Regions:
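Short, solvent-exposed secondary-structure boundary motifs
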Residues: 1, 30, 42, 69-70
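Short aromatic-glycine-(Arg/Gly/Cys) micro-motifs in beta-strand/loop hairpins
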Residues: 2-21
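Generic hydrophobic secondary-structure signal
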Residues: 6, 15, 32-34, 51-53
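Compositionally biased, intrinsically disordered low-complexity regions
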Residues: 12-15, 28, 57
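Short, surface-exposed beta-strand-loop junctions and turns on beta-sheet-rich folds
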Residues: 20-24, 31, 68
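Short capping micro-motif at the N-terminus of alpha-helices
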Residues: 24-25, 63
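A short, charged, amphipathic alpha-helix used as a generic interaction element across diverse proteins
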Residues: 26-48
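Short, mixed-charge low-complexity intrinsically disordered segments
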Residues: 44-70
Length: 70
């Protein structure tokens, strides 16, 4: 399983892969677009993907590959 996350860190939106930052200083929409693209590529290679996206008020949405959502 691979995990991608978009969170607000130090005032910047950051994209993480498996807990490690891979890109920062982005707008929220650009970070989400990047994370979704990376998640799609991972799914294409047969990986199970967890995508976590932080909202503006700190709430987290979670999506697992296959369209499951909490």
């Amino acid at each position: 399983m691979v995990q991608y996350a978009v969170t607000l860190k130090g005032g910047d939106w950051t994209v993480f892969r498996d807990g490690e930052p891979i890109e920062h200083g982005m707008s929220r929409s650009a970070a989400i677009q990047m994370a979704k693209g990376l998640a799609f590529e991972a799914e294409e290679h047969g990986d199970t993907v967890e995508l976590l996206i932080q909202g503006y008020y700190g709430e987290m949405s979670r999506r697992l590959s296959g369209g499951a959502e909490d």
